[in-house]
Amino acid sequence: MELALITAQQVAVLFLLIGTGMVAVKTGVLKLENKQALSNLLVYIVVPAMVVNSYRMEFSAQILHNLLAAFGMSVLSVLLGTVITLLFTARKTGSRMPIFRFACIFSNAAYMGFPLISALFGSEGLLYASAYVTVFNILLWTLGYGLVSGGSSVKEVARSLVRTPVLYAIVVGLGIYLLQIPLPTLITQPLELLAGVNTPLSMLITGMLIAAGDVRSIVTDKHIWKLASVRMLLIPAATLALFGVLGFHGTAAQVVTLLECCPAAAITSVFAVQFGHDEHFAAGSVVLTTLLSIVTLPLCALIITMVM
């Protein structure tokens, strides 16, 4: 119950930050074309700094064990979501299906998940979240890229992975953690300051995305509601059930499960534009699932604390 209340409070805070982003766009303080630059700042600088900073803790064999377990649980959860999505859409065709499948499988772990995990579980939770994001990125740029591009070469996939900065941040962070490398204040202070930017910046970007969408047309689109039911209800419930059957519990399991409860990945819209898919459907999927998460995330946290 305590985790659910903290989650509800944190989601409310995130929603206020999202609202700030929406107001900033509506009043002209921020332009929609600024979204890509802010997103690049987040992905290439802020999130990597936050990941490296999260590894700055005293070595613990138990935490290392939990970290390795988090990697395994992350692989299991994302693959489970993939199987569920492919089964759900097995007999469905249409131009929206690539985006439908992608948005169901891949959650907004970085934008929505990291701020939430940081607030609920602190640095240890971020360690386990970084394990999830590592698995997430590898599958996103292989399986996910293939889903929306209609097939991709090994060279294209490798190039995409090499351009994923958070993977380098995890390697550096792991090195610092395992070798217990002391960092000077000149390095740690900028890392901490940049890490602190993650939550407000990611929520401002989410608010800008919502401001750009037509909420009325989004909430009347039955296909987006079907997508939301898979992304926000079916996959989290299946993950929770599977982890319960396998006896997974503790902070690492809670973190991975909560990340699976997050809305559709913001990059869904980017891929829709890049590969000529229905970008309004993609943006609508992100917007609706993000709005629904204001209610569903606290409920998921409540259930997680009851069974894990």
Where are these regions (language model features)?
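Alpha-helical transmembrane segments of multi-pass small-molecule/ion transporters
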Residues: 1-308
